[in-house]
Amino acid sequence: NVHITADCSILQHDYSWAVIQRLTGEVLGSCGTVRIGNNVFVGQKSLILKGAEIGDNTIIGAGSVVTGRLDGNAVYAGAPAKKISSLEAYIDKRRKLQLNEAVLLVREYEQTYGTRPPKKLLREFFWLFEPRNTQLDEVFQKVFQLDNNTERSQQAFVQSEPMFSSYEAFLKYVESNS
């Protein structure tokens, strides 16, 4: 259950021996293993080098260079990749930022297109305003189906409370906070 996004590379070898070969004629091969745990996200254009071990439940930011061992339940970024947050702290951060980012999305859409965005455009934010039932729009149902985690996502959704009573109530909030 690993998400490796566009333009990532995983290298289990090292061609730097070519310099040695040119200097001495020797071919001194170099290789190693790469281990990636379960429930890992690797951001775009990241590079995972030989000997890397990535623990379970790990997020790696875009453009990172992964070497050595990265413990699980954490967020890493940089070159070389360094721990920037526990996964728990990142989840708390996302819960706090979600509303502001949804508002920003609506404002940017309105500014660009001169009209309110269709509800379906906010497919990552529907937890903020959709009633708690399983009779959701197909676009939102598909979000549940990502990662073959439909049942767990639906259960979490139904057991949670929306911040707004409807999409219209959410849009009124956006208007009143402009």
Regions found by a protein language model. Give the residues of each.
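Terminal amphipathic alpha-helical/low-complexity segments used for targeting or macromolecular assembly
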Residues: 81-178
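Residue-identity detector for threonine
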Residues: 5, 24, 33, 58, ...
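Beta-rich strand-turn-strand
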Residues: 45-59, 64-68
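Flexible, glycine/small-residue-enriched loop-and-beta-strand segment within the central core
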Residues: 1-53, 79-80, 85-88, 92
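Short, well-structured beta-strand-loop connectors
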Residues: 42, 60-61, 76-77
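Hydrophobic alpha-helical segments of small multi-pass membrane proteins
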Residues: 32, 62-65, 75
